[in-house]
UniProtKB/Swiss-Prot annotation:
[4Fe-4S] cluster binds at C94, C131. It catalyses: N2 + 8 reduced [2Fe-2S]-[ferredoxin] + 16 ATP + 16 H2O = H2 + 8 oxidized [2Fe-2S]-[ferredoxin] + 2 NH4(+) + 16 ADP + 16 phosphate + 6 H(+). PANTHER family: LIGHT-INDEPENDENT PROTOCHLOROPHYLLIDE REDUCTASE IRON-SULFUR ATP-BINDING PROTEIN. The modification ADP-ribosylarginine is found at R97. This is Nitrogenase iron protein. Homodimer. GO terms for biological process: nitrogen fixation. Its EC number is 1.18.6.1. It is an enzyme of class 1 (oxidoreductase). Binds 1 [4Fe-4S] cluster per dimer.
């Protein structure tokens, strides 16, 4: 079983990218579980056809300790297993702590057991690695591979670099490695070349360049992944290609984060900061 965490700046398209990739892996015959680690609880919506899933923390709050696995896991597209950790009530408590509680409960209830025949577990993790709770999949060895969703925008690259610092910090203790950058295009000038160069300087690869296409939004409005909504569309093939590359990936590294001056130089060299 491969355990993968998807990180990236807030709003970069992590949840969309994760769910479309999972659809591609499921279509290939893989058994996949998705653990949403975001208080918004939108990490599994497209796989579940728009159903808003009751989160682990909400279930715990309402049911107490008497929770069964089927209360918190729903079956989605391609027999994927979907669960959302959720978060505390707004203004109360720590969302990162909620992720720790949720993942521990999933382990106790046997969500990762061999009987489920899982090939992959995906953690879709909120935003930047800003607090210990969100770093948990890296820190505690819950995830072995990290993929960072990035674009050619400065803050997305800045966040990717910060996430690499987190991976570096926990690489020895948790054994986690960076599998690559996924460029979710924003149609920035020289975007592909810039992210390839960022990946090179970090010591990793740009595993796939996902072009911008309105089909992604159309599928989302219809509460589906692109592969589910329009399987013959070019964008569906892009996600299939990304799924295949992740499936076949053998490049796992401890990244070399850039200094802020190096990152700014990269932006200047590719014409963004001019």
């Amino acid at each position: 079983m491969r355990k993968i965490a998807i990180y990236g700046k807030g709003g970069i398209g992590k949840s969309t990218t994760t769910q479309n990739t999972v659809a591609g892996l499921a279509e290939m015959g893989n058994k996949v579980m998705v653990v949403g680690c975001d208080p918004k609880a939108d990490s599994t919506r497209l796989l579940l056809g728009g159903l808003t899933q009751k989160t682990v923390l909400d279930t715990l709050r309402e049911e107490g300790e008497d929770v069964e696995l089927e209360d918190i896991i729903k079956e989605g597209y391609g027999a994927s297993r979907c669960t959302e950790s959720g978060g505390p009530e707004p203004g109360v408590g720590c969302a990162g702590r909620g992720i720790i509680t949720s993942v521990n409960l999933l382990e106790q209830l046997g969500a990762y057991d061999d009987e489920w025949g899982l090939d992959y577990v995906f953690y879709d993790v909120l935003g930047d690695v800003v607090c210990g709770g969100f770093a948990m999949p890296i820190r505690d060895g819950k995830a072995q591979e990290i993929y960072i969703v990035v674009s050619g925008e400065m803050m997305a690259m800045y966040a990717a670099n910060n996430i690499c610092k987190g991976i570096l910090k926990y690489a020895d203790a948790g054994g986690v490695r960076l599998g690559g950058l996924i460029c979710n295009s924003r149609k920035v000038d020289n975007e592909r070349e810039m992210i390839e160069e960022l990946a090179r300087q970090l010591g990793t690869q740009m595993i796939h360049f996902v072009p911008r296409d309105n089909m992604v939004q159309r599928a989302e409005i219809n509460r589906k992944t692109v592969i589910d909504f329009d399987p013959s569309h070019n964008q569906a093939d892009e996600y299939r290609a990304l799924a295949t590359k992740i499936d076949q990936n053998e490049m796992f590294v401890i990244p070399k984060p850039l200094e802020i001056e190096e990152l700014e130089k990269l932006l200047i060299d590719f014409g963004i900061a001019n």
